[in-house]
Amino acid sequence: ALPIWMINSRIYIGHVGDSRVYRIRKEFMRRLTKDHSYVQTLVDDGTITKEEAYRHPKKNMLMKALGCVEKVEPDVYTKTFIKDDIILMCSDGLTNMIREENIYEIIKQDKENAIENLVKQANDNGGLDNITVVIIM
């Protein structure tokens, strides 16, 4: 789950699972959420690298998700949103098929057609899961 509220120059994110929110600002893209997955815990404690996580066979094993238990506490993030920032919300169907640096390049090359281009690239790369992409400019 990934509800977002934007009020003035603030963005409020509620997060559970492995869908992600990124902020693209000028020349970089930063992930604003942290996956609730087994593989993310391995990355966090230094057992595997981010590169190894991308190919890990258990990368879709969630540690926290809606519907798994009766009550789930979401992570809540508050971030600054400034003029010309781009917010990307996406499911793991995108991030499992396209590396972050390539996602950034696709968006920067053609903002107006970025959603179509991202979904096409993810499908061309195998499209193994549902692909959800929302871009806020």
Question: What residue ranges belong to the model's regions?
Answer:
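Short acidic-glycine loop/turn motifs at beta-strand connectors
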Residues: M6-R10, I24-F28, M137
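Amphipathic coiled-coil signal-relay and dimerization helices
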Residues: I13-H15, R23, T33
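An anion-binding catalytic pocket shared by soluble metabolic enzymes
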Residues: R20
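Conserved, helical-rich catalytic subdomain that frames metal- and/or nucleotide-binding sites
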Residues: K34-K83
